[in-house]
UniProtKB/Swiss-Prot annotation:
Binding positions (substrate): 27-31, 77, 154, 209, 327
Gene: hemE
Name of protein: Uroporphyrinogen decarboxylase
Site (Transition state stabilizer) residue list: 77
Keywords noted in UniProt: Cytoplasm, Decarboxylase, Lyase, Porphyrin biosynthesis
Superkingdom, taxonomy of origin: Bacteria
């Protein structure tokens, strides 16, 4: 593997000195870019794009050609793991992801097999190794997975949900059944993420997109408990370097202290959290990633600049901050505005690292 030329992102996650605040964007390879749309059209559909290692590599690299980013993130989907368990993932226009065979009974959950990441998920591993090779050491590669709770919401509900009625019913009516599913998913995610590291991922992120839908105590029981299990089981060193781990619970501002106790290296923040307050609460233990509202990118470059300045000022001096959005970039954002955001981080952040 080529030697890493820009390790700013990895250093910030480990709270080591940096010359400026590193920046990347969740969903930076995505529908806001015309070149992504062209590649997706070439693939035919979303999952065909994910499963073609050369096209997945191409869309991963596209934002890096446009912008001076400090990290690349694997182009894939969080639902690859349940798909590999045989649930029959498909996408309906306007409806999002759906499963042909939901796992909403104890019998269906008992039948689930933990997928071999080099077999059923081999296409992801081939994409990871291809991307790592093609990056040529320019920036580190982030691997990722959904959290067990978030994956389970799709598996039990049969797809996206606004109310999570089925899985919450299971949580309170048949908690042992849900724990069986979450435990299988945690084991699957550990294997999946460790295989990503073995194939070239240099940092890992766990997306708990729907943890914020849980009550205070239910979050610890059904989400955090299983992210803790994953953190405990991950490969934390590869290629002579530490492999940092970031946990991100959307709507998780209540639980930052508990999340920081897992032993992860960093926490992702959504835009509802004041990053300065988060630093005072947990900055002695973990780095922080975030957290500009993605909708700010609809604003003028001047307003984007102001928002970046405000977040940098709130975090304050020193390392331990990776600038990002508070969630994925919206598909209708002007790519030029994304460029303004990244340039503003570069321009304004150096003064905080003297």
């Amino acid at each position: 593997m080529a030697e890493l030329k820009n390790d700013r992102y990895l250093r910030a996650l480990l709270k080591q000195p940096v010359d400026r605040t590193p920046v990347w964007m969740m969903r930076q390879a995505g529908r806001y870019l015309p070149e992504y749309k062209a590649t997706r059209a070439e693939a035919g559909d979303f999952m065909s794009l994910c499963k073609n290692q050369d096209l997945a590599c191409e869309v991963t690299l596209q934002p890096l050609r446009r912008y001076d980013l400090d990290a690349a993130i694997l182009f894939s989907d969080i639902l690859t793991v349940p798909d590999a368990m045989g649930l029959g993932l498909y996408f309906e226009t306007g409806e999002g992801p759906r499963f042909q065979r939901p796992t909403d009974t104890i019998d269906s959950i008992k039948k689930l097999c933990i997928p071999d990441p080099e077999d059923e998920l081999g296409y992801v591993m081939r994409a990871v190794s291809t991307i790592r090779r093609e990056l040529k050491g320019e920036v580190p590669l982030i691997g990722f997975s959904g959290s067990p709770w978030t994956l389970a919401t799709y598996m039990v509900e049969g797809g996206s949900s606004k109310t999570f009625e089925k899985i919450k019913k299971m949580a309170y009516e048949e908690p042992a059944t849900l724990h069986l599913l979450l435990d299988k998913l945690a084991d699957s995610v550990i294997l999946y993420l460790n295989a990503q590291v073995a194939n070239g991922a240099q940092s890992l992120m766990i997306f708990d997109s729907w943890g914020g839908a849980l009550s205070h105590h239910a979050y610890r029981e059904f989400s955090l408990r299983y992210m803790q299990k994953i953190v405990d089981g991950l490969t934390r060193h590869a290629d002579g370097r530490q492999v940092p781990v970031t946990l991100f619970t959307k709507g998780g501002g209540l639980w930052l202290e508990s999340m920081a106790e897992t032993g992860c290296d960093a926490l992702g923040l959504d835009w509802t959290v004041d990053i300065g307050d988060a630093r005072r609460r947990v900055g002695h233990k973990v780095a922080l990633q975030g957290n500009m509202d993605p909708s700010v990118l609809y604003a003028s470059p001047e307003r984007i600049h102001q928002e970046v300045d405000q977040i940098l000022s709130s975090y304050g001096e020193g390392t331990g901050h990776v600038f990002n959005l508070g969630h994925g970039i919206h598909q209708h954002v002007d790519p030029e505005h994304a460029g303004s955001f990244i340039n503003s981080v570069h321009e304004l952040s150096a003064q905080y690292h003297k």
